């Protein structure tokens, strides 16, 4: 079964082969719904609410990833949790490779189930704290993770580029200013996005040439 909410949302973001990808995302939502009562993956309980607030929210950055990444790129998802945005992006971009990083055992177990059930060959799962990861990524991403000022050193050890999901109520400019005060240099763009059916707005922060001289 395909959730119409997901399909229409993907179409609004300009996703290629939206119908096929909506089917896989609906199967992913089935797994979230099935395991959520025992694993407490997300706070919401209603299917449509999870579809909007987590799956479509994760998919909203599709145009940004399309523009800033390419086939074969390795993308790290910090604190992947239940797979938002990493699993969603892996479904939307089967030609990119996604490394999902989390240190909570129950979440890691769920991610492994999702990878197996959905045959996501472009997904790798790391059961590690971010600071212990020794890899180089084309770009990293994270959603509902820690403030930028708390992850600066960890990020620049992995990459110089990031695509970050931030709530509008987050004081993004203040977070960026704190990074500068800490000695980081970067080029940052703040892009507003909206989720069909959701009043809450989201910003995508694109960080380039992020480093600490």
Label every PLM stretch briefly.
Residues 95-213:
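S-adenosylmethionine
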Residues 77-81:
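Conserved S-adenosyl-L-methionine
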Residues 2-76, 106-109, 113-123:
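Class I SAM-dependent transferase core
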Residues 82-95:
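Conserved SAM-binding loop of SAM-dependent methyltransferases across substrates and taxa
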Residues 32, 89, 207:
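Residue-level signal for inorganic ion chemistry
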């Amino acid at each position: 079964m395909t959730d119409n909410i997901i399909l229409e949302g993907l179409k609004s973001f300009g996703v290629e082969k939206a119908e096929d990808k909506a089917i896989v995302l609906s199967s992913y939502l089935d797994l979230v719904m099935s395991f959520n009562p025992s694993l407490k993956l997300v706070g919401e309980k209603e299917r449509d609410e999870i579809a909007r607030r987590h799956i479509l929210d994760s998919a909203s950055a599709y145009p940004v990833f399309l523009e800033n990444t390419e086939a074969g790129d390795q993308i790290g998802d910090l604190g992947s949790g239940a797979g938002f945005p990493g699993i969603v992006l892996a479904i939307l971009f089967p030609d990119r490779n996604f490394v999902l990083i989390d240190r909570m055992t129950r979440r890691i177990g769920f991610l492994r189930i999702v990878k197996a059930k959905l045959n996501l060959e472009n997904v790798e799962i790391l059961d590690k704290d971010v600071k212990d990861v020794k890899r180089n990524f084309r770009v990293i991403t994270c959603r509902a993770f820690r403030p930028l000022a708390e992850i600066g050193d960890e990020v620049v050890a992995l990459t110089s580029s990031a695509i970050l999901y931030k709530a509008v109520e987050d004081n993004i400019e203040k977070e960026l200013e704190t990074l500068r005060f800490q000695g980081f240099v970067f080029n940052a763009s703040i892009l507003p996005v909206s989720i069909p059916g959701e009043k809450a707005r989201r910003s995508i922060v694109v960080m380039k040439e992020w480093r600490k001289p």
